[in-house]
Curated annotation (Swiss-Prot):
InterPro entries documented for this protein: YdiH (IPR031830)
Name of the protein: Uncharacterized protein YdiH
Species whose genome carries this gene: Escherichia coli (strain K12)
Length: 62
């Protein structure tokens, strides 16, 4: 089992916990969107990631 963070695995886990009722097409679209977002987040440095978290917190995004 790999401990390396993978954008696809993170997106699938996120969607698995999501309570939204999505059609198969909506699910795939959301999966691709989340993969891109997680891939971007994984490229950030620690300081950049902290800045993103703080910015999201200020906007009320949980």
């Amino acid at each position: 089992m790999s401990t390396q963070l993978d954008p696809t695995q993170l997106a699938i886990e996120f969607l698995r916990r999501d309570q939204s009722n999505l059609s198969p097409a909506q699910y795939l679209k959301r999966l691709k969107q989340l993969e891109l977002e997680f891939a971007d987040l994984l490229t950030l440095s620690s300081a950049e990631l902290k800045e993103e978290i703080y910015f999201a917190w200020r906007l009320g995004v949980h």
